[in-house]
Each structure stands twice: as structure tokens, then as C-alpha cells.
């Protein structure tokens, strides 16, 4: 639940969501009109989509921690020594933000998220600044707009401004052309399924996109790399018919627009 009081924004987070994995995605709703656009430039258009990035909220004492799970390894066994001991020292989460608890009930906590939504890289375009060639942030022109909550996700709309300076071709002592670009973005924070998909290793005979993880399970003293495929969560609508080998529709079909 979102509450607004003047310039302050608060989120009431149920205890049932603390520790649950969520993902953050960013969509450009309105892009800036730039004077010169590189021909090989891939991003910077309305509808461009960035992410996802995985996060979770955890409560420690009177603080709520926004953490980023480190998902680059598998097979770490707390009961083993060797490289497993070194892996445990790194931990499984990276701390991103600390939010003091403003109030709490028996089943939820209230935190202020004004600064988080305005300045944290997870909720703005900063991680994609190189691709977008945005320049310096003009903080005074940034605004958090409409925030909509749904059962499994929340949408945050905001305006972002950046100052861009283009220097003369070939260098020299001349001053560059300086101007401001303005963007409207939509950030989606959505709850991931509590039961993750079973990990499937890459097969060279099947053309899936894949990603690599460091595998600690093969040896106490040596690391190996395992490639996992990227796939959609397709659950058969009629499991019995699917088990008989019949063609069935998924519960949530993939829709392309």
C-alpha cells in the first residue's frame, strides 16, 4: 500500500512479502528528442525495456533492508570446507538501501521511500546512462508521478531530466552544445513466484539463450561453470491431457504485441 503526504511517499510492506524475491523493470514511456542520434544506437526510444533486476526486502530490527540476491553461483554447501568456506564469507546478498521503520503493526511495517524512488539507481535510468548517453542528472527537475498498486506488482511513473553537452568534432578549445533531455519512465516492481523454476542445463542441440553460473558442487577445491537456459514459465492448463501427450494451452499464454 502506498501513502503520500506532501512530498513524502510511504510504503506499507506486509510481513508476508519480506524475504520474497521481486524483480524491477524499467520502460521508457516518453523519450527525449535529441538533436543528433547515432545510427548504431539501439536504445532511447519510447517503449524500450530494461531489466529485470532481482531484489528483496528483509527486516532487521527497526530497519528494512533492500537487498540484491547474488544469483551467480550454485551448489554452495555450508557443511563443507575448502572453497565453500570462502564462498560463505562473501554472503548471498548485496545491500542496496537501508530504510528505517516509521511504524509497524502485527503484520506489516511502514517505511518512507521518497529518497529511494527518486535517487536509487534501481528506480531511475542511471544504470542505462551509457547506452542512452544521458549526461548529468538535473535533480531539481525530477518528479515522482503516479504510483499504482496491484495484487502482485506496483507501477511507479516518474519524470527524469539530464543535461547533455556535445563537444566539437575533432576536439579543440571550443565549448560544446549544452541542452537538457527529459524522459518519462515507468518502473515495475513485481513479486516473483515463490516456487522458482527448476534449473535446466544448456543442451547444444537446442537453441536456447543461456547464462552461466559458478558451480561449487563438483569439488571442494575446484570451481566449474554450468550453463542454464532462459525459458518461459509455461504451466499446462490441463495437466492430465498434457501427461497423455496431447496438445494443450498454457495457463498464462505468451502474448506478443
Predicted regions and their residues:
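Auxiliary tRNA-acceptor-end handling modules of aminoacyl-tRNA synthetases
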Residues: 1-257
Amino acid at each position: 500500500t502506498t501513502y503520500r503526504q506532501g512530498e513524502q511517499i510511504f510504503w506499507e510492506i506486509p510481513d508476508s512479502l519480506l524475504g520474497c524475491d521481486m524483480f524491477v523493470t524499467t520502460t521508457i514511456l516518453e523519450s527525449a528528442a535529441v538533436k543528433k542520434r547515432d545510427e548504431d544506437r539501439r536504445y532511447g526510444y519510447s517503449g524500450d525495456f530494461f531489466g529485470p533486476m532481482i531484489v528483496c526486502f528483509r527486516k532487521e530490527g527497526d530497519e528494512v533492508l533492500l537487498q540484491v540476491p547474488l544469483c551467480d553461483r550454485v551448489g554452495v554447501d555450508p557443511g563443507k570446507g575448502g572453497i565453500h568456506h570462502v564462498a560463505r564469507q562473501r554472503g548471498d546478498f548485496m545491500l542496496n538501501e537501508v530504510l528505517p521503520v516509521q511504524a509497524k503493526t502485527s503484520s506489516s511495517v511502514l517505511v518512507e521511500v521518497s529518497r529511494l524512488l527518486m535517487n536509487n539507481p534501481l528506480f531511475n535510468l542511471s544504470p542505462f546512462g551509457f547506452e542512452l548517453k544521458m549526461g548529468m542528472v538535473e535533480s531539481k527537475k525530477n518528479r515522482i508521478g503516479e504510483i499504482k498498486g496491484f495484487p502482485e506488482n506496483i507501477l511507479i511513473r516518474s519524470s527524469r531530466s539530464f543535461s547533455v553537452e556535445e563537444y566539437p568534432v575533432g576536439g579543440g578549445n571550443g565549448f560544446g552544445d549544452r541542452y537538457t533531455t527529459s524522459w518519462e519512465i515507468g518502473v515495475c516492481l513485481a513479486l516473483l513466484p515463490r516456487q522458482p523454476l527448476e534449473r535446466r542445463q544448456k543442451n547444444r542441440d537446442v537453441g536456447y539463450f543461456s547464462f552461466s553460473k559458478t558451480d561449487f558442487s563438483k569439488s571442494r577445491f575446484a570451481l566449474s561453470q554450468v550453463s542454464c537456459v532462459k525459458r518461459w514459465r509455461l504451466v499446462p492448463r490441463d495437466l492430465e491431457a498434457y501427461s497423455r501427450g496431447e496438445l494443450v494451452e498454457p495457463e498464462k499464454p505468451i502474448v506478443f504485441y
